[in-house]
Amino acid sequence: KTYIMHNIEPFYGWRDRYIVEEDERSPFFGHQHNQFAYDQKIYNYYVHPQWNNFGSNTLLLKCLYTDYELGYTIIEFIGEWNDFLHNDIEMLIRSIVNPMIAQGVFRFILIGENILTFHGEATDYYEEWQDLASESGGFVTLVNLQDHVRNEMKDIGIHQCLRLDGQVLDWRKYPPEFLLRACIQEALS
């Protein structure tokens, strides 16, 4: 599979309902994207300017939708998830997850189809994240992972902390509530 990174945009179909940079409760509130130039890279590959950097050198994200009343968020990722070299999970928890939990978000749906590879080391931070979410009746689930990424995550035991759900086909055609319901149904089955 050949990846043309700068052509991969975060999903924008729900922007009429939610824009993370306009959400005063979001860690990305007020962030300005360069609309005229590609200024972010993962390794030597430029990526679309709409992705948000949370401090990782190899992994970017976009918070597609957050509903504080129902306490959930949907986050899409692109790049290499590298806990081994960069401790991406610690940065993610400290800069994104903890502030969102403080705002009442306890259900995390992570879209992983653009995670190209995973390098893990330990499950401590994943266990912490699951504990924080489940204390409020929530969960953390990764959906639409590529098979090799799912296997890489299972190899270090992440599937014992977080849900590594299967494919949620054509989720982009539906409202965000559909994805939430699908993840809840999967968790209950």
Where are these regions (language model features)?
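Amphipathic alpha-helical interaction surfaces in cytosolic regulatory modules
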Residues: 105-108, 112-157
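A cross-taxonomic marker for long C-terminal extensions/tails that follow the last structured domain
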Residues: 6-16, 148-189
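Aromatic/basic-lined ligand-recognition segments
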Residues: 31-34, 40-48, 127-128, 134
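Short, low-complexity, polar/charged sequence segments that are solvent-exposed and flexible
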Residues: 93-98, 127-131, 159-163
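A short, well-ordered alpha-helical element
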Residues: 84-106
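Extreme N-terminal leader/targeting regions
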Residues: 2-37, 51
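STAS-typified acidic loop motif
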Residues: 46-92
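Flexible, charged surface loops at secondary-structure boundaries
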Residues: 67-69, 100-103, 135
